[in-house]
Amino acid sequence: HKNILGALATVAIFIAIVLMVYYRKHVNQSTFEFIIDMLIVLSILWAIYGIYEQFQIYHRLGVDHFTFKVYARRENRLNSVFYNANYYAMMIEFIAVCIVYKFFTVKNDLKRSIFYVVVGFLNLFMLYMTGCRAGYVAIAGAICLFLIFNRNYKLCFLIALGCLGVVGFFVLNPSKFPRIEYLISNLDVRMKIWNCAIQGIIASPLLGQGPFTYMMVLNKYNGHLTQHAHSVYLDPLLSFGIIGLALLVPYVYDNCKRLYKVKEHYSYIALVMGFIGVLLIHGILDYTIFWVH
C-alpha cells in the first residue's frame, strides 16, 4: 500500500512492545510504586508548564486577566508538554486513576494522602482548561470502575451522584460547558471521520493497510483531514484488520490469567480496570493511545 509512514510507526510500536516485555520481566512491587509516584509528581510539572502556556495564550490574544473560558482553536488550547490538548487530557485521566490508587493504598500517612488529594484537584483543574470534553466522562467512568473493583461501593455511589450534579449544572448553565458552541459541528466532523473509516475497513477488512491508514484513504472516501479515525473501536480495525487484532487475543488472555492470580489484591486489579476504562471510554471519541509517547 506504499504506507511508508505506517511502516515506520510499526517499527516504533515493536520497540515499545520490547520495552514493555522487558519491564514486565524485571519490575518489582517497589519499582512499580515508585513509577506511579514519579508520574504523579511529574504531573505537577506538566500543570505548571500548562499554566504558563495558558498565560502565554492570554497574552497573544490580548487578554489581561485569568478566565475560565476555553478557546476552540487548537493553537489556543493548552497542551503542556504533549502533542495537543487531547493528548494531555488523556494523560491526566491516567494520572487521576494513579492518584486514586495511591490514595487507597497509602497506609497511615496523612501528609501523603493530602498530597494526593491536592494533586488530584490540580489535575482536574488542568483537565477543564484543556477543553477536552470527552475527558470528563472518561475520568468519571474510570474512577467509578476503580471504586467498584476496589469494593468502595458507597463512595462510588456518592461520586456518581456528584457527577449527576455536575451534569445538571451544565444542563442548567450550558454556556459554562467548554466549547459548547462547537459541540454539534464537532460531532458532525466525527461522523464524517467515522464514515470514512468504516468505508476503509470494508475495503480491507482482514489485514488493514497499516498505521496511518486513515490519512491514506481520507481523500478517497471524502473524509475529514486528520491523522486517525478518532475511535479506538475503528482505527485498529482500519489499520490492522481482523487478523491483526486477532493476534492480540493470546496477549489479552495471558494478562487476564495474570490478573486472576492476584485477585486478592483489589487495588491492583482496580488500577488496571481504571486504565482500561480510560481507554475504552475516551476511545469512543478519540484515538490518543496510538502514539508511543
Regions found by a protein language model. Give the residues of each.
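Membrane-interface helix caps and helix-loop-helix hairpins in membrane proteins
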Residues: 1-5, 128-129, 178, 284-290
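Membrane-anchoring hydrophobic segments
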Residues: 1-22
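Membrane-interface micro-motifs in multi-pass membrane enzymes
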Residues: 3-7, 79-92, 133-135, 229, ...
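Alpha-helical transmembrane segments of multi-pass inner-membrane proteins
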Residues: 12-16, 33-66, 72, 80-149, ...
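A membrane-periplasm/extracellular boundary helix in multi-pass inner-membrane enzymes
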Residues: 33, 48-57, 130, 147-187, ...
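A conserved mid-to-late transmembrane alpha helix and its immediate loop/hinge
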Residues: 80, 124, 195, 224-259, ...
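Long extracytoplasmic/lumenal interhelical loops at the membrane interface
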Residues: 176, 181-195, 199-203, 207-240
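Membrane helix-loop boundary segments at the extracytoplasmic
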Residues: 240, 270-293
